[in-house]
């Protein structure tokens, strides 16, 4: 279906998509190998939306680390929260430096404020970053708790017809 959509866009517009953005809803991994193979075939970068998939894995590899970029969210309803904000995973220093430069207002290295490009103010506060770093140390505990709650639901609802609990693809 993905490849069909790419070819359809190319036929209709003469252009390939600028990016492929797979989304890990409810911690459920997408098929990273298939998506990356198709993306590589057409030279399209992958930006993984792992906001709901933090800590989830596909064949042992953490979501957000397959594509050119991975995006995490630290909103209040996520596995780890800083009350807002997020993180960007970059595969190389050049991309990381470019993103940081734009996220910190694209200010040029002069003693006065000079901007040769439009930048943004997307920095997380030091306090929020500290909260996030502290919570990273207990990410595995949060994941284990969620799996425990899932197993409770499975046990309590197993005899009710029509109810199916989704399992992580990596789970047996």
Protein language model regions, located:
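Solvent-exposed, non-transmembrane amphipathic alpha-helical segments
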Residues: 46, 83, 90-91, 115, ...
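PLP-dependent aminotransferase class I/II
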Residues: 3-15, 19-23, 28, 32-34, ...
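Conserved PLP phosphate-binding loop immediately N-terminal to the Schiff-base lysine helix
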Residues: 1, 19-35, 44-73, 79
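Active-site PLP attachment segment
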Residues: 65-103, 126-131
